[in-house]
Amino acid sequence: MAGKKEFSIFDHVLVPEHRVLSEEEKKALLEKYKITLAQLPQIKASDPAVKALGAKPGDVIEIKRKSPTAGVYYYYRVVVED
C-alpha cells in the first residue's frame, strides 16, 4: 500500500478559517458575553480541525464563517475530551 498522503484541511473551500484564542482573548470573550466555558458550544478534541491546530481541551476555537447575508461572522467553541 502507498504511503499515507497528508494535506491541510484548511485548504478545502468548505472549511472555514479556525484559530485558537490566547488566554487573554478567551478571558475577554467570556467577560464580554458574561458567560462561562460550560456555556459555549463544544467541539471534540478528535475533530480534524482541532487536531490540525494542535488545540487541547479547555482551549477556545474561533471560527470565521462567511455568510451571504451577514458578510462575515465569528463562532466560538470550546474543545472537550472525546
UniProtKB/Swiss-Prot annotation:
Part of the RNA polymerase complex. This is DNA-directed RNA polymerase subunit Rpo5. HAMAP family: RNApol_Rpo5_RPB5 (MF_00025). GO terms for cellular component: cytoplasm; DNA-directed RNA polymerase complex. GO terms for biological process: transcription by RNA polymerase II; transcription elongation by RNA polymerase I; tRNA transcription by RNA polymerase III. It comes from Pyrococcus furiosus (strain ATCC 43587 / DSM 3638 / JCM 8422 / Vc1). It is found in: Cytoplasm. Transmembrane segments: none annotated.
